[in-house]
Amino acid sequence: KAVSKLKAQISKEYLSAVSYYCNGINEYAESHSDQILDTGIFPVSADKVIEAQHLLEIVGIQLDKPYSYLRGPKKRSKGFPNKEGSNILAVSGNHTRCGNSIIAISPHQPLEGIFSFYEIHLFYRKSGCELFGFILPITFTIFMGTNFKVAWGTTASYPDMYSVYKVGLKGVFNKRLNVTEGLIPLNRSAYFNYTLLYGKFPAPIVKQYFTTPDGKPIVKINHRYFLIDIPLIGYKLGTELNYRISHAQSNNEILALTLDYGYPYLDLVSIDTKNNILYVHNSHEPIRASEDEYMSDILSLDSLTQLDNGFEDGMFYIENPKS
């Protein structure tokens, strides 16, 4: 469902780029079968690539951290881990010896795993565009880097990425969500997970979760039920914005793209060849019932009424700061 929603919003240009990407890796896999570790994943379809790119964004939210916190000792005094991005540092030409604006990108990516660092240097013969930077697995767009007209970096705006609600369910077999207006029927889903017997032998176990009619998951942790709302799902695809930014020629163009696209959850810093600096806090937060709820780790059931009331546009930008 998320892929269908995304495809309705993705530009034809980006959909074509995804198709070309699939054609290229499928042809390579066919002609280099001896280098393919798992031939079963080929041929790769455009839908699967979009799904994987979006899943990479969802995994990047780091939902494992609040999940681990909720599963941890009950006497734990600390709240959810503080999550602040630290990928970019830019200095205005007003404060550098050379008089030029400087940007430092520190992606601190691991060399293995789903967020491993892949450094690439590309040159498009047709357009004459040259790109240098890094990409993440299953993507083909520069996440941070330069096209030698602009240089940019992004970092996650974590607090706005998800909300956790403590909820109550009724029923034994047919679970229903208990809200002020009444009982809402839920969908039940099951999946296999694995545990280690005696710390050595993997053994499959069946886990279950529930979803609301609009698709929000409800999980049981330590005998309590939590609803997890992730507004990003099916809303925007960050890799498309990266694709468009990588061809920008100035900060003004990047600002226009971010304003037009409205991609949530990423703070962006860029400089251009005229030594301009741009900072964009491009975030959307669910509207809360009170100011205190913006700082709460777990929200009450009453706050569920806020989910369908839209988003507060928290986007702002700063150009060429004086200090």
Language-model segments: which ranges?
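Compact, glycine/acidic-enriched structural inserts
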Residues: 126-203, 242-247, 256
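Substrate-recognition/specificity elements adjacent to catalytic centers across diverse enzyme folds
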Residues: 1-114, 119-141, 230-231
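Generic, well-ordered alpha-helical scaffold segments in large soluble proteins
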Residues: 21-24, 28-31, 73, 94, ...
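Structural recognition of the beta-strand scaffold that forms the well-ordered cores
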Residues: 90, 102-104, 142-145, 150-154, ...
